[in-house]
UniProtKB/Swiss-Prot annotation:
One of its GO terms (biological process) is pyridoxal phosphate biosynthetic process. Catalyzes the hydrolysis of glutamine to glutamate and ammonia as part of the biosynthesis of pyridoxal 5'-phosphate. The resulting ammonia molecule is channeled to the active site of PdxS. NCBIfam families: PLP_synth_Pdx2. InterPro entries: Class_I_gatase-like, PdxT/SNO, PdxT/SNO_CS. Keywords: Glutamine amidotransferase, Hydrolase, Lyase, Pyridoxal phosphate. This is Pyridoxal 5'-phosphate synthase subunit PdxT. Pathway: Cofactor biosynthesis; pyridoxal 5'-phosphate biosynthesis. PANTHER family: PYRIDOXAL 5'-PHOSPHATE SYNTHASE SUBUNIT SNO, PYRIDOXAL 5'-PHOSPHATE SYNTHASE SUBUNIT SNO1-RELATED. Pfam families: SNO.
Amino acid sequence: MKVGVIAYQGSFEEHAIQLKRAMSKLNLTGEVIAVKKPKDVDLIDGVVIPGGESTTIGIIAEKLGVLDEIKAKINAGLPVLGTCAGAIMLAKDVSDAKVGKKSQPLIGTMDIQVVRNYYGRQRESFETDLDFRVIGGGKARVVFIRAPIIKRTWNDATALISFENGIVMAEQKNMLATTFHPELSESTIVHEYFLSKIKK
């Protein structure tokens, strides 16, 4: 199993560590690959789009030709986990809590509406416990950093976990989106669940 993590900016190392921990817990043999060029996408069985600045990630990925390559692979069934900025990249509908609709390069494969910077400056970063029973876990502490929120889902996209009147984890076929940072959690449940989607 080869899992790619888009590695232009954001928490590549943290995701790599969590993926390796999750592989170990699930007794899976695999490696984590930094995805920077279109050819890297051909090597992987699943991809993580990490947190960071979604506009920057999108612009770099578009310029290097990775954006279209990943979009085509996701549409063909490649499992993907988008976290925070990665969830924004996956969304078909994106707006900003302050400035409304925002134009930026997106992958745009998931039937979710995401609002950037949802929690505002008062709560730029915070931690809370979420219940992961729906994906086979228990309660786990998670970190939100200038987090977006998933306002709604449609078609066969479904809300998995909600918090404070918004969706913080959603799923649609081979796509998984979280508005928190599972790579900064002690728990590996989100990465384990993602790896189980690759294994199928």
